[in-house]
Amino acid sequence: MIRTIQAEEITRNIKEMCIEANHVLSDDMKNVFCDAVRREKSPLGRQILEQLEENLKIAGEDRIPICQDTGMAVIFLKIGQDVHIEGGSLADAVNQGVHDGYVEGYLRKSVVEPVDRINTKDNTPAVIHYEITDGDRIDITVAPKGFGSENMSRIFMLKPADGIEGIKEAVLTAVRDAGPNACPPMVIGVGIGGTFEKCAEMAKHALTRNLEEEPPTGYAGELEKELLEKVNRLGIGPGGLGGSVTALAVNIETYPTHIAGLPVAVNICCHVNRHAHRII
């Protein structure tokens, strides 16, 4: 049976989620961050983490952005095949929600044309990823992405012979090269397989996973654990000033790939790993 959803309902939810994601970190991120404060061995690193923790608290209580870079809006939509949208197109509804959220929420407008650098003045357009699923609901994830860490992200088109050791080295290379520029402690999304664009999309989506969920089964889960340990042994530390907590998590997504390739994308996010989730 077809279920009708009004475009304005999508717009309203996107607006609220843009503001929410920029003011308050999800509970899983806050819990992992608190744990990092306890685990950090460096006195300077712990001091930095405590300052960042205080910043998170102030932002949530005063309803102000956690970071001055309120990001480019990345939206993941899982649209049930039994949904009919009435009152406008889905893309227009999403972008209107981003416009309303950033303008009415007084969030920084950071989106410009790529060459002439003219600002669009409302943080649109969003980057929208669509997936058709069963059912009559729309699953929405809003993930504002700041560009300090985005600029440190990498894609590696490895050879099949590079294997799992090549994947490990690719991730460690990206993190080493990022150093303090990604505002550590980081959350690291890794996409393995697919094509050039598929691995990048997976790496981005991996950042939205609830950090308190069970890790993936098989080699991906083991690789997450190993890479997190290796990354934290790099000693980059909070703020890039040294310490035992360089990353809060490594999240991996995989997809089958061509016999001739091994694409790997590493999407780095700073400690302000923002995402809001709703189902309508």
Which ranges hold each PLM region?
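Non-transmembrane, aqueous-exposed alpha-helical and coiled segments at domain scale
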Residues: 1-190, 195-280
